Amino acid sequence: MDNKNLELIKLNKHISYITSTDVPLSANVVLVNGNDHVWMFDVGNHPDIQEIVNEFNRGGKKINAVLSHFHQDHIGNIQKFKFDKVHQGRLTFKHTGIGDIIESDIYIDDGDIRLHIFPLPSSHSKGSLAMEADETYCFLGDGIYAMEKSGEKVYNAGLLKEEINVLNTVKADNFCLSHREPFITPKEIVIRHLEKIYGRRSKNEAYIKDC
């Protein structure tokens, strides 16, 4: 196995994450060790992720997945695992063809772990999901990033406002962003950044350039 570009980093006794890579492009993968299941937030696209997950899950627990959105770097390994359940948005389901569609907030208790899975309005990808763990960490995938439109990175102004409103209700103080180092950014900094972008909107313009 060549996983020299991958690291498994521990956040606390229950939660770890696998670092992202550029070649192949692969998102961060979050691993939550519940009482009955191991939970994966995104499954990545790097071929060595499966072996790292197997090592993490030495007890052989069933595995559930929560997919942030449908881009390949987040779901590329979906067929490499035998999941008990897969939670995703409607557009992601069109790409995976397996699991459940989540369109409203759900709360799950798995031993000492409490998960909050919820739809996240996002310019980057419609139908995104986020996952909050123990009101401590909130995993956002690429949810706060811009989208590509006519060769420019832009935000949909309406979706951005909705996203800010949703993120303000999250109790966790630590927001975790894929492809970003450090992985953790304080909630207040993320929201301040998004509010600054929203503040640049022009009247009657649907999109805001990401400068």
PLM region spans:
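Metallo-beta-lactamase
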Residues: V38-M40, R114-H116, P121-R200, E205-Y207
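Active-site HxH/HxHxD metal-binding segment of metal-dependent hydrolases
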Residues: H46-D109
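Conserved beta-strand hairpin/beta-sheet module of binuclear metal-dependent hydrolase folds
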Residues: K4-N54, L129-Y145
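A generic local structural motif
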Residues: N3-K4, L25-N28, Q50-E55, H71-I75, ...
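Structural signal for conserved beta-strand scaffold positions within catalytic alpha/beta enzyme cores
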Residues: K10, Y17-T19, Q88, I117-P119, ...
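Short Gly/Pro-enriched turn/cap motifs at secondary-structure boundaries
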Residues: S20-T21, G99, P119-S122
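Short glycine/proline-enriched coil/turn segments at helix->beta-strand junctions
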Residues: N35-D36, R58-K62, Q79-K85, A133-T136, ...
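Short, conserved active-site loop motifs that form the nucleotide-linked donor/cofactor pocket
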Residues: I15, D84, G99-D100, L115, ...
